[in-house]
Amino acid sequence: MRTIKIGSRASQLALVQAEIIINMLKEKFPQYTYEIIKITTLGDRILDKTLDKIGGKGLFVKEIQKALAEEKIDLAIHSMKDMPGETPEELVLGAITKREDPRDVLITRENKSLEELPKGAVIGSSSLRRQAQVMALRGDIKVVPIRGNVGTRLGKIETESLDGVILAAAGLNRLGLKEKISSYLEIEDFTPAVGQGALGCEARRKDIEMLEMLLAINHEETYRCVMAERAFLKLLEGGCHVPIGAYGQQQGQELHMTGMVASSDGRRVIKEQVMGDIADFQALGIQLGETLIEKGAKEILETVNTDNRIVNTEGS
């Protein structure tokens, strides 16, 4: 009997997510045994720098992908929002599970919404995408970088005297911490990260047995939407750690998709929408990316990347 070795980050949230996938597989394939292999990624090891300052793409996935390619594990579980646009040729995303709530949320001391926070409030965030959109909506708010797992970031409201922090709704829901949420940042105003709320299952291209198993747990609607978002991301050559977001939603036989690129300070925000036949999901993602490029998205992202390179040079 085959034991399926599943690679996961070691955080509480990552392990909960791995168990979600294992339970889905067990229901369909009870004849196998399943084992979680904990893997520490570069993003987990370096906690004294913001993600955009570490540089590179795939900070939370590369080591897991390496273990998969080297056949130390059979299956890699990722938060889709951590996945760079490019994946290694020998690996394939065999399944994307049904999306959890894709929204970002605000957790504040006094249960206030973003609009209700006082002038000059200090918010903690781990991403430039969130920082840029907060500053675009509330230029008077100060956004400070915070790192660590969900519990650590929640704790920083007290330990670092923050007025609040921004996290993903999906992670809090999966950890049973929904009651912590003060307010939801609605998608119309606050574009999520590419793939936010969805889990991805990656296997070796040559492992036909594993890929057939993954097909049984794939959520086709979420798969199409997220792959459209990833086509957008790939065209813009954006990593997970630049101010870029996209969200696709199937409505009937149509895909409705929003894409956003912003400067780090939120002073420039380009946001566009596209809709079309869901069967053309990849092409729609590319079309949306091309529209943003025509409006100056590449120049904005290059400025962000240049700023990060300067900071990295000064810090070395």
Swiss-Prot record:
Q: In which pathway does it act?
A: Porphyrin-containing compound metabolism; protoporphyrin-IX biosynthesis; coproporphyrinogen-III from 5-aminolevulinate: step 2/4
Catalyses which reaction(s)? 4 porphobilinogen + H2O = hydroxymethylbilane + 4 NH4(+)
**Note describing how the cofactor binds:** Binds 1 dipyrromethane group covalently.
EC numbers on record: 2.5.1.61
- One Pfam assignment: Porphobil_deam
The record ties this protein, via NCBIfam families, to: hemC
General remark: The porphobilinogen subunits are added to the dipyrromethane group.
Q: Which family does it belong to?
A: Belongs to the HMBS family.
Instruction: Please state what the protein is called.
Output: Porphobilinogen deaminase
Give the organism the record lists.
Alkaliphilus metalliredigens (strain QYMF)
What gene, per UniProt, encodes this protein? Answer: hemC
